[in-house]
Amino acid sequence: VQAYALSAETVEPVSAVAEENCISGSWKRASDPALTEKVRKVFDKAFEGLEGVSYMPVALLASRTTGSGIQYRILCKATVVVPGAQEEYVVVTLQRGWLGKAEILDIGDPLCLTNLDHEEGAVGAWQEAESPAMTEEATAAFNKATVGFVGVDYVPVALLSTQTVAGTNYRILCEATTVYPGAEMHYAVVNVYESLEGNANIISVTDEYVS
């Protein structure tokens, strides 16, 4: 991701971004991960004409205002345009310049496969969340599952999908930071299981370098 020096004159409030939720540097975590029409337009312009891989935006993760424009980190579902290709989650960084130009700054490594079953009501399948905003149920399960967890600090930012089993599995995108001085935040997908009795634990975690 390219970095730019901040100018006090160009810093302005960004829609759907909480000023107090600073990630690292000048990135600010989105207070609501739902994609706004404005962000969708930037995404569509930036990816217009791109061939070889199909990208579908899922959630707004963060944004920052720089001297060159407003930058966005967006979670996407990506599929290589070849028969049998599997859908993956990736984080892309886009920029809307002050003159309106939209461009791709970075496409991250795959986080993991989506494993989504797009047949509505499929039993035992991962079903995409209606909204990327964390639900009360997902938040409660995540909090119970991470009690006493040490080594890495996980902050949930978006609910990706759920799976009904003997209980419920939640697939959650998190900001992950290893607990040591100077560690940088990266994104990780955390799978949490909550039993019918209300007990919860982490099933698996995949960081940005694991597909």
Which sequence ranges carry the predicted segments?
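N- and C-terminal low-complexity/disordered segments
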Residues: 1-211
